[in-house]
Amino acid sequence: MAKAKFERNKPHCNIGTIGHVDHGKTSLTAAITKVLAETGGATFTAYDQIDKAPEEKARGITISTAHVEYETTNRHYAHVDCPGHADYVKNMITGAAQMDGAILVVSAADGPMPQTREHILLARQVGVPALVVFLNKCDMVDDPELLELVEMEVRELLSKYDFPGDDIPIVKGSALAALENSDAKLGHDAILELMKAVDAYIPQPERPIDQPFLMPVEDVFSISGRGTVVTGRVERGIVKVGEEIEIVGIRDTQKTTCTGVEMFRKLLDQGQAGDNIGCLLRGTKREDVERGQVLCKPGSVKPHTKFKAEAYILTKEEGGRHTPFFTNYRPQFYFRTTDVTGVVHLPEGTEMVMPGDNIAMEVHLIVPIAMEEKLRFAIREGGRTVGAGVVASIIE
């Protein structure tokens, strides 16, 4: 049978399965592809295909992730599934596989377990916007009251971590039943119901081009007779020639005007998300701008020095530190295009952080950086990556 060409005429959304080990994340991923394959919305991908996920590198960290794609009538999805718990932690913190939403898989037979809690907390910390719950293995639970109890527990846990526990859709079913065609109600129908919930409940992410303009500064040149040109890749939004923009980070914020946009040596009237451009700035001196700052829409991003972060610290085997670190640890934090020194403050009751740990910590940078929640960074010592993190909240 000829492969159908994937039409890109549907809105795209990135999701993933999260939850405790052996609660059925990978089986569910396989079941979704099986059920949607009936209507031509996917190619069935078996459990063992997904489970031997290839390794990939993100921010110097090796992570195993499996990617499958499928579509419903409303949307096209890229779905990520990780084989091990450590891969989830790394994935969510580095943003290697950006998630616009996630399906939390909980085994009805076991109820919420330690990693269920940890994945919900991580989803909150790294800013996953919405969750939908699949209560798996319902064919192993005969007592409907027990099912209700597990559902209540899950809702309480979600609320505890600031997700709307009362409103989140919880779909009861069995991934195995769907894969083995044993129970249509808990299998096939539950999967369709789950996808309906995902379609309806996980908000469509705003496309990068529709967001306010931002471009990290990579290089600065002075062109005689024309002025200063700043180069970089536009991260989001659009910059039009003649628009006022701000230079944010490292020093005091300055206003300037973009008087020209150049790409591949051609002049354009605008640059947009994904473009590698040179931006000509009016009245800005070569020494007024440096790598590590950003150009952005005025007022859209502010410089900050203090923030709370969720970080993963590499193990020795991953090329990280061999020893733990303590409060007042001073590494470099690599934001976008540059390193900035910062001081780490560990939470009350945390004596030290071991290689391989993930940790919530407070960081004070020695110079301000254009910063927002969900911004990713690497932790480095003399150019060597020893960790990865994400801004969970800004203090000042």
From Swiss-Prot:
It is found in: Cytoplasm. Its EC number is 3.6.5.3. One of its GO terms (cellular component) is cytosol. Residues 60-64 are annotated as: G2. Residues 10-206 form the tr-type G domain. Mg(2+) binds at T26. GTP binds at residues 19-26, 81-85, 136-139. It comes from the Bacteria. Keywords: Cytoplasm, Elongation factor, GTP-binding, Hydrolase, Magnesium, Metal-binding, Nucleotide-binding, Protein biosynthesis. Residues 19-26 are annotated as: G1. It catalyses: GTP + H2O = GDP + phosphate + H(+). Pfam families: GTP_EFTU, GTP_EFTU_D2, GTP_EFTU_D3. One of its GO terms (molecular function) is guanosine tetraphosphate binding. Monomer. Belongs to the TRAFAC class translation factor GTPase superfamily. Classic translation factor GTPase family. EF-Tu/EF-1A subfamily. This is Elongation factor Tu 1. It comes from Rhodopseudomonas palustris (strain BisB5).
